[in-house]
């Protein structure tokens, strides 16, 4: 609570710097928060700092699809007898008709994802019960605290493996797994919490059944953690400037490009709007 306002945010110009000799307070956030600042400081500001928060656009069809698949792959483990067919039926239970072009498009994609989840589970998704399902993990590195939720954590003969489900049309590659900052940070957090090495990370593309994987080393994980700390230092400086100057801060430029067409906050960003027309809610599923 802010001493200046009695509420959760301070009046611009009243932020207090740490006392001399005192360590910097922890900067806490998720991998998504770090990537938001890296990708577009303007979106980061609107999403995490501006209060009241700008209204976001309604959910897109591919998000509705992804949520249904993730929910089904989580809830299948709560069934008395988890089976591939039962997991597929859970897609129907979790489905929401939000963002689709019309009921027919929603129906087609629901059937596709029901079949995809069934096939994924039949191909080995039920081989062993995970150590964690949508498990929250966290670690602290100096003045950085990272916390996030992993889709699945496996113990494969003593090896801890971080698994992330993907449902987009693009099939991930091993290089995607290698370069993923979130996966590496989740692995570092698992290692810290379980006190056992967690070096393997995997992207499971549910629609195709493809698995992209990378085996980190302790050194490569350390480099990813340092990358996160570098982003955090820049974000911390921007946060402090926002606390002092509010909307007058110049440390949150809009990074314009193709992603502006998909941004949930583009209605509040003139630069993003000028980058090109907005994509329809169902555009990610359009070529079906």
Predicted stretch roles:
Residues 68-134, 140:
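A non-catalytic, helix-rich entry segment at domain boundaries
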Residues 189-288:
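Metal-dependent nuclease catalytic regions and adjoining charged, substrate-binding loops involved
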Residues 135-230:
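Mg2+/Mn2+-dependent nuclease catalytic core
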């Amino acid at each position: 609570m802010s001493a200046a306002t009695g509420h959760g945010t301070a009046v611009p110009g009243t932020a207090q710097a740490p006392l001399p000799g005192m360590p910097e307070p922890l900067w806490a956030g998720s991998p998504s928060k770090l990537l938001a600042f890296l990708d577009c400081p303007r979106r980061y500001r609107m999403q995490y700092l501006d209060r009241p928060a700008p209204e976001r656009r309604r959910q897109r069809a591919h998000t509705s699809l992804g949520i249904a698949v993730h929910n089904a792959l989580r809830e299948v483990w709560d069934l008395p007898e988890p089976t591939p067919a039962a997991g597929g039926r859970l897609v129907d239970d979790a489905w929401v008709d939000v963002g689709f072009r019309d009921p027919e498009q929603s129906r087609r994609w629901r059937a596709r994802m029901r079949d995809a989840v069934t096939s994924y589970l039949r191909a080995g998704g039920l081989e062993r019960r995970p150590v964690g399902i949508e498990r929250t993990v966290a670690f602290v590195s100096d003045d950085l605290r990272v916390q996030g939720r992993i889709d699945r954590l496996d113990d494969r003969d003593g090896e801890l493996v971080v698994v992330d489900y993907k449902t987009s049309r693009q099939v991930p590659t091993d290089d995607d797994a290698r370069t993923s900052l979130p996966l590496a940070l989740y692995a570092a957090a698992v290692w810290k919490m379980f006190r056992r090495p967690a070096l393997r990370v995997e992207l499971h593309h549910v629609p195709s059944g493809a698995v992209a994987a990378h085996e980190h080393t302790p050194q490569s994980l350390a480099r990813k953690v340092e990358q996160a700390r570098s982003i955090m230092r820049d974000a911390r400086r921007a946060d402090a400037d926002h606390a002092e100057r509010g909307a007058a801060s110049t440390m949150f430029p809009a990074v314009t490009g193709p992603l502006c067409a998909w941004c949930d906050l583009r209605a509040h960003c003139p630069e993003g709007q000028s980058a090109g027309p907005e994509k329809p809610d169902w555009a990610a599923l359009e070529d079906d």
